């Protein structure tokens, strides 16, 4: 079987607390691990997307609406729906160990937020930063 869920692929989380949210695969485990003996992936996603900004709004309001919130999660392949999009962001601050240690996870989330905000400010990959309508 062809492995098409590679790192950088944009996916939609289908179940759980973040169902319907867009995420990017950071690291994939096709054969599983000893603790999780099934195919899964470490994903970084948008918990809260940036809102629409207009020129009429003040700088303060524009800055507030441009913020985003991220999440880091290990998800079973059955609960991911791949899209045709990719996002080339280097999430080197996110490791598999960040999932187990809560303090490392908080630091990794902050790092991911910073990287995704930089990507958002460039104006590329607009689809990823919009709310999924359903």
UniProtKB/Swiss-Prot annotation:
GO MF term set: structural constituent of ribosome
A matching Pfam family: KOW
GO biological process: translation
Keyword terms, alphabetized: Ribonucleoprotein, Ribosomal protein
CDD domains membership: KOW_RPL27
TM stretches of this protein: none
Domain called KOW: residue spans: 5-40
Gene Ontology, cellular component aspect: ribonucleoprotein complex; ribosome
Family affiliation: Belongs to the eukaryotic ribosomal protein eL27 family.
Protein name: Large ribosomal subunit protein eL27
Species in which this protein is naturally found: Pyrobotrys stellatus
Source species taxonomy: Eukaryota, Viridiplantae, Chlorophyta, core chlorophytes, Chlorophyceae
Gene from which the chain derives: RPL27
């Amino acid at each position: 079987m062809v492995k098409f869920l590679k790192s950088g692929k944009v996916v939609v989380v289908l179940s759980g607390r973040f169902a319907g949210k867009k995420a990017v695969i950071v690291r994939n485990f096709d054969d599983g691990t000893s603790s999780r003996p099934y195919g899964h992936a470490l994903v970084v996603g948008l918990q809260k997307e940036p809102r629409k900004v207009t020129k009429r709004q003040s700088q303060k309001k524009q800055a507030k609406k441009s913020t985003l919130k991220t999440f880091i999660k290990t998800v079973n392949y059955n609960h991911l729906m791949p899209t045709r999009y990719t996002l080339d962001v280097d999430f080197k601050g996110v490791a598999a160990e960040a999932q187990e240690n809560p303090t490392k996870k908080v630091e990794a989330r902050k790092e991911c937020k910073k990287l995704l905000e930089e990507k958002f400010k460039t104006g590329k990959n607009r689809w990823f930063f919009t709310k999924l309508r359903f």
